[in-house]
Design a protein with these regions (language model features):
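A conserved mid-protein helix/loop that constitutes part of the nucleotide-sugar donor-binding site
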Residues: 16, 214-237, 253-259, 342
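Nucleotide-sugar donor phosphate/pyrophosphate-binding loop at the beta->alpha transition
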Residues: 121-123, 130-153, 199
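Carbohydrate-associated surface elements
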Residues: 163, 184
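Aromatic "clamp/platform" in nucleotide-sugar-dependent glycosyltransferases that forms part
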Residues: 296
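Conserved acidic donor-binding segment of nucleotide-sugar-dependent glycosyltransferases
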Residues: 328-330, 334-341, 349-356
Length: 393
């Protein structure tokens, strides 16, 4: 089977999947990218700095960059583009199927309509959930009708997790067309071999947390929708009960304000580590006792995968999509109500109580996330391709 994949730009999370797919027997894969320089020294507004990923994103699979053209009524909207060159490449490529992850961009719709018009099987893998969204009225009715139509045209729905599958089925999707292809990271990258408590204590000392009873970790952009200031509100309620250390890995426009806010609390230890590449993250995860993900909007949240691959529990808001797949109370972490600092404080305190008692099982946490792997995603793609091939034969 010849499979075309359309993506906006290379990323450290998707390139490993494409490399793995390129090794599948009987599959000829080609990835089309619209933008070349993102993640290669270009300014990222979310991190508020220039970002260069330190992993090779373009080896191990066939790819080609195509040139998008701005829409005349949105000349400065980078991702709102049309791309006649891409459509020509899809026409001449003689592809058996096309993978277009979502449906939110103009370019997505050019690809979707091209596939439908030419009777080419269409695969999709959207971040489909309604967390934190109240849908009602005519717009919701139109959205429902639209998704009913769209999913009826999709040949294979690759779901990243439970919420995406439930959303697909609620919109009239067929069970037989749904295949599990989870969002995943390279779990092995975060699993330190021969890990011991002595190693953890050594890492804590390295970052200055040796006097802390509980070390919290946040990893990600410092922007409003991530809700990082909620951690400040929560730990203020706990600082007289627990000697808390906080490690923040990431950057963004809110960094200066957050530094001032956390400094005023008087934590046992506070470290802003700035942006770190994925290859450097393992030590930060292993130095921490728990990852906190307080987002107001988070369709999945791959930092949850990274933390659990490292063997540490996660406290995540109920707006984090991966929480509904990966978090088991008292086993892999806790879920709290988004925006509620009292709820977050309670869950952090429960983590501390668990740590004082039997603690969380590192091996259980790692086993839980082991099914959310690149290999499992490849199996999902392979099953979808087998299904589509059998349907068309």
């Amino acid at each position: 089977m010849r499979l075309a994949i359309v993506r906006t730009h290379p990323t450290q999370y998707f390139s490993p999947l494409f490399k793995a797919l390129a090794n599948v027997s009987g599959l000829e894969l080609k990835v089309f990218y619209l933008f070349e320089n993102r993640g290669r020294g270009e300014f990222d507004p979310g991190f508020n700095r220039n970002i260069s990923w330190d992993t090779e994103l373009l080896t191990g699979y066939e790819y080609e960059f195509v040139t998008p053209r701005p829409l005349p009524f949105k000349p400065k909207a980078v991702f709102e583009s049309r791309c006649p060159e891409l459509i020509e490449k899809l026409k001449s490529g003689n592809f058996d199927a096309i993978f277009c992850a979502g449906y939110g961009l103009w370019i997505d719709w050019q690809v979707i309509f091209f596939a439908i018009r030419n009777n080419i099987p269409l695969f999709c893998r959207p971040e489909l959930n309604d967390l934190g969204v109240v849908r009602r009225g005519p717009r919701n009715w139109l959205r429902t009708r639209f998704l009913n139509w769209y999913f009826s045209k999709v040949s294979a729905f690759l779901f990243i997790g439970k919420l995406a599958r439930d959303g697909y089925l609620s919109m009239g999707g067929e069970v037989s067309k749904a295949f599990f292809a989870p969002y995943a990271v390279n779990n092995e990258l975060f699993q330190l071999s021969n890990f011991t408590e002595e190693k953890k204590n050594s890492l804590k000392e390295r970052f200055g947390f040796e006097k802390c009873e509980l070390v919290l970790l946040y990893v990600g952009r410092l922007v409003p929708r991530k809700g990082v200031d909620l951690i400040a509100q929560a730990v203020t309620k706990l600082r007289h009960k627990i000697k808390i250390g906080l490690l923040i890995v990431g950057d963004g426009p809110e960094r200066s304000a957050l530094e001032s806010e956390f400094d005023a609390i008087g934590l046992e230890k506070l470290v802003f580590a700035g942006f770190q590449n994925q290859s450097k993250l393992s030590d930060y995860y292993h130095a921490a006792d728990v990852l906190v993900v307080p987002s107001f909007v988070e369709p999945w949240g791959l930092v949850v995968n990274e933390a659990m691959a490292s063997g540490i529990p996660v406290v995540a808001s109920d707006r984090v999509g991966s929480a509904y797949d990966l978090i088991e109370p008292e086993k892999t972490g806790y879920i709290f109500k988004a925006g509620d600092s009292f709820s977050l404080a309670k869950k952090i305190e429960q983590v501390f109580e668990m740590k004082q008692g039997l603690g969380f099982s590192r091996s259980y946490i790692q086993r839980k996330v082991s099914n959310y792997s690149i290999q499992e995603a490849v199996r999902g793609f392979s099953a979808a391709m087998k299904y589509v091939s059998s349907e068309s034969s």
